[in-house]
Every structure is written in structure tokens, then in C-alpha cells.
């Protein structure tokens, strides 16, 4: 089992796809890494030699911020925006869309499930 940046890559997938299971590595970055290390993208993860895994691990850990480091960096950037009181920081703090999207309708992903508002009670009939 290939373990890179603290993530176990799925054994039966191609290396090109398997690398995308690491937070911070998408398909294009995966292709860059494979080109830099000279590993064939069509190779299955289970067929990688120890040397290939070591080369991939070295490339990822030396040249890219991934997993915990990247998550920490993103959290620090958001915290900085909140601390200095920017508009974007306020939107993050309030849990609303940050990039100018409308909120009168939509924005459900960012705002969460719709909360039920109690309606007017009907008067008891006579």
C-alpha cells in the first residue's frame, strides 16, 4: 500500500487518479508530479515499486503544500481576514457567501438548511 503525505492511496486505481486523494492535489497537479518523477500515469498504485513510491513521496513533500499544512494555511488566511475586519472576513464569520453571490434566494450550501419559521396560529373555530 502506497502511503504519501499521510494518505493511503487506493490500490486498484491508476497513480494519476490515486494522487488526487491527497488534499491539495488535483488532476493537473498529479500529472505535473508524475512528469517530474518519470512515473507512468497509467500504472496502478499496487504495481508501483518502492523506488517509485519514494520518488513520488519526495516530490510531493518537498515541492507542494498538502494535507494538514495546506488546511492550516487556509485556516490562517481566513482567520487573518476575520481579525483585520475586512468585508470578506465578516462574511466568513457570518457564514455567508464571500464572493458576491446573491443571498435573497439560494446560498443554501453556505447558510445551511432552511429554518422553519412558525406561522400564524389559526383561531379555534366556533
Swiss-Prot record:
Alphabetized Gene3D superfamilies for the sequence: 1.10.8.50, 30s ribosomal protein s13, domain 2
InterPro entries: Rbsml_uS13_C, Ribosomal_uS13, Ribosomal_uS13-like_H2TH, Ribosomal_uS13_bac-type, Ribosomal_uS13_CS
Transmembrane spans: none
Keyword tRNA-binding: yes
SUPFAM superfamilies documented for this protein: S13-like H2TH domain
Region: Disordered, residue numbers: 92-126
One GO molecular-function entry: tRNA binding
UniProt cross-references to Pfam families, sorted A to Z: Ribosomal_S13
One Gene Ontology term, aspect cellular component: cytosol
Top-rank lineage group of the source organism: Bacteria
UniProt GO BP: translation
Composition skew (Basic residues), residue ranges: 101-126
Keywords associated with the record: Ribonucleoprotein, Ribosomal protein, RNA-binding, rRNA-binding, tRNA-binding
Free-text function comment from the UniProt entry: Located at the top of the head of the 30S subunit, it contacts several helices of the 16S rRNA. In the 70S ribosome it contacts the 23S rRNA (bridge B1a) and protein L5 of the 50S subunit (bridge B1b), connecting the 2 subunits; these bridges are implicated in subunit movement. Contacts the tRNAs in the A and P-sites.
Similarity annotation: Belongs to the universal ribosomal protein uS13 family.
Subunit structure comment from the entry: Part of the 30S ribosomal subunit. Forms a loose heterodimer with protein S19. Forms two bridges to the 50S subunit in the 70S ribosome.
HAMAP family: Ribosomal_uS13
Entry protein name: Small ribosomal subunit protein uS13
Organism phylogeny: Bacteria, Bacillati, Cyanobacteriota, Cyanophyceae, Nostocales
